[in-house]
Amino acid sequence: MDLIPNLAVETWLLLAVSLVLLYLYGTRTHGLFKRLGIPGPTPLPLLGNVLSYRQGLWKFDTECYKKYGKMWGTYEGQLPVLAITDPDVIRTVLVKECYSVFTNRRSLGPVGFMKSAISLAEDEEWKRIRSLLSPTFTSGKLKEMFPIIAQYGDVLVRNLRREAEKGKPVTLKDIFGAYSMDVITGTSFGVNIDSLNNPQDPFVESTKKFLKFGFLDPLFLSIILFPFLTPVFEALNVSLFPKDTINFLSKSVNRMKKSRLNDKQKHRLDFLQLMIDSQNSKETESHKALSDLELAAQSIIFIFAGYETTSSVLSFTLYELATHPDVQQKLQKEIDAVLPNKAPPTYDAVVQMEYLDMVVNETLRLFPVAIRLERTCKKDVEINGVFIPKGSMVVIPTYALHHDPKYWTEPEEFRPERFSKKKDSIDPYIYTPFGTGPRNCIGMRFALMNMKLALIRVLQNFSFKPCKETQIPLKLDTQGLLQPEKPIVLKVDSRDGTLSGE
């Protein structure tokens, strides 16, 4: 039996021509960085360097940084990706040339009406939405919203107490994932869910389904390899985000909005209410107000941006506190001094806790959940003698910079004192857990407040210790956002017999 099919000469010729054309298409941009004298790993035809992401984006960036120095070039399919680590160049990209050249983040491909979400919106559309949402995230508004977040802190303590009383080690992701879910659905959708005890709630199920997204998702990969397919997918109504989930969440926002507009009572001040108010505000006359679909897109993107990140950072923080009991005790001492006898936290009390701020900042240095910052180059530009072509993507490898011994002594060590106000100031273009410049994370203040409140509440009531199930040293996962390879498990001891917040 012949192993080679007996095909006509014309068929073989057509096949050969097709393969040559595919090769030419798959390598057409791959000589760019070599011509510019920028080092980097050799790309594969069609794929570029995306297969290297399987080892973990954080690991890939760190290895490239060590091997190639302060700048290197890679390819995602045909897309040239330039990594920069020089603080002056980073400042130019994120701040000085943000509005003119580096306004937009990565294009995800077909996302339907979610393209108006603040994280995905582009150019003038992004500017408009950012200016409409910015008043929602001021410290004054967060202070007004604080009691809402605080009530979920009470639920967090109750749930952790219940788990700890079983006498078994506690999986932190379960507890903090529920807290994060409760806060985000409560503030963005106006619904109260004790998600740990109501896992079948449609909100919980929809949100978790929405979050199952990775860099190696087949649809996402096909868009990286063949970006010209994006308009085809859009015409076919194909979206990266699960359609049934998006529809459910969008309808939920509209239903809650109608309910609040029909009910003339004063409603609690959460993100949803602030966005509804902005639709009717005279202050928005300089910008077109948010449409109902745009409002829904913002509520939905808050889940995507906040759920996994908040629960992961809280888990990482308590892992570090459990493995550094001296730091844990010092932090508990500060909390007890500012809030004696387990007094309920206030906005002002949280803001004044310096050591808590240092602990959270150091955790975000070691574990920046967004491994990279990404900006698309809108036009040919030269920065510090480096030519960056239109259409390429510039990345700032946050994880690699946060672990660079040039900037951090013994970078793998957990040392909150690095962020002491008595020390030299930290370079804002090297330490970027929330990005920096006009397109930084709009929810930064909210995220920090949310995490700090959770830490205060649990540390008022409990102490955390490693147990035999705790993975030491901690290993990081290789997929998607920065998270542990295995869920973090710790022993939880009650600090006394009384339950705070009850």
Curated annotation (Swiss-Prot):
User: Annotated pathway, please?
Assistant: Steroid hormone biosynthesis; Cofactor metabolism; retinol metabolism
Q: Which Pfam families match?
A: p450
Listed InterPro entries: Cyt_P450, Cyt_P450_CS, Cyt_P450_E_CYP3A, Cyt_P450_E_grp-II, Cyt_P450_sf, Cytochrome_P450_3A
Report the protein name in the record. Answer: Cytochrome P450 3A5
Native species: Homo sapiens (Human)
Could you mention a single GO BP entry for this protein?
Answer: oxidative demethylation
What family does the entry list? Belongs to the cytochrome P450 family.
State the top-level EC class: oxidoreductase
Quote the function comment for this protein: A cytochrome P450 monooxygenase involved in the metabolism of steroid hormones and vitamins. Mechanistically, uses molecular oxygen inserting one oxygen atom into a substrate, and reducing the second into a water molecule, with two electrons provided by NADPH via cytochrome P450 reductase (NADPH--hemoprotein reductase). Catalyzes the hydroxylation of carbon-hydrogen bonds. Exhibits high catalytic activity for the formation of catechol estrogens from 17beta-estradiol (E2) and estrone (E1), namely 2-hydroxy E1 and E2.
Q: Where is the protein localized?
A: Endoplasmic reticulum membrane; Microsome membrane
Q: Where does heme bind?
A: 441
